[in-house]
């Protein structure tokens, strides 16, 4: 009988621990948050397209995710027979907000060294898309 009470107490504590954890990563706000516009890191190999250089692995970042504003297009009303822009559109894109210039040197055949440059994304945000 004593073992059954202990097992029931442990089961109840486990249930409370599981129920108490529902506000963390299983919450729908977390799922929405994980899809928002944000910076994602990845590793890529950089090599020169023409010269025979040793490639280098580099940590890069990209902006990816959804913006909360809805996209839409609506017709423009005009009293002209020619409509240069028949629609007004609005949309928001996940784009880099801040970045910094980075460089790396590749060793090539014949002792030559080439410098590759790229922008490393520091932060991302939603902004109106350009046409």
From Swiss-Prot:
PROSITE patterns: CTCK_1 (PS01185), CTCK_2 (PS01225)
Domain of life: Eukaryota
Domain CTCK: 37-130
Cellular compartments annotated: Secreted
Tissue expression notes: Expressed in the outer nuclear, inner nuclear and ganglion cell layers of the retina.
Keyword Cytoplasm appears in the UniProt entry: no
Keyword Cytoplasm listed: no
Annotated function: Activates the canonical Wnt signaling pathway through FZD4 and LRP5 coreceptor. Plays a central role in retinal vascularization by acting as a ligand for FZD4 that signals via stabilizing beta-catenin (CTNNB1) and activating LEF/TCF-mediated transcriptional programs. Acts in concert with TSPAN12 to activate FZD4 independently of the Wnt-dependent activation of FZD4, suggesting the existence of a Wnt-independent signaling that also promote accumulation the beta-catenin (CTNNB1). May be involved in a pathway that regulates neural cell differentiation and proliferation.
Name this protein carries in UniProt: Norrin
Organism: Mus musculus (Mouse)
């Amino acid at each position: 009988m004593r073992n059954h009470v202990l097992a029931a107490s442990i089961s109840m504590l486990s249930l409370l621990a599981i129920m108490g954890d529902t506000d963390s990563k299983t919450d729908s706000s977390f799922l929405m948050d994980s899809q928002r516009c944000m910076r994602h890191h990845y590793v890529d190999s950089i090599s020169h397209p023409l010269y025979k250089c040793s490639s280098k692995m580099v940590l890069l970042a990209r902006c990816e995710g959804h913006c909360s504003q809805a996209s839409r297009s609506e017709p423009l009303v005009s009293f002209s027979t020619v409509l240069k822009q028949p629609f007004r559109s609005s949309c928001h894109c996940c784009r880099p907000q801040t970045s910094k210039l980075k460089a790396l040197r590749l060793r090539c055949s014949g002792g030559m060294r080439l410098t590759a440059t790229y922008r490393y994304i520091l932060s991302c945000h939603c902004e109106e898309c350009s046409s």
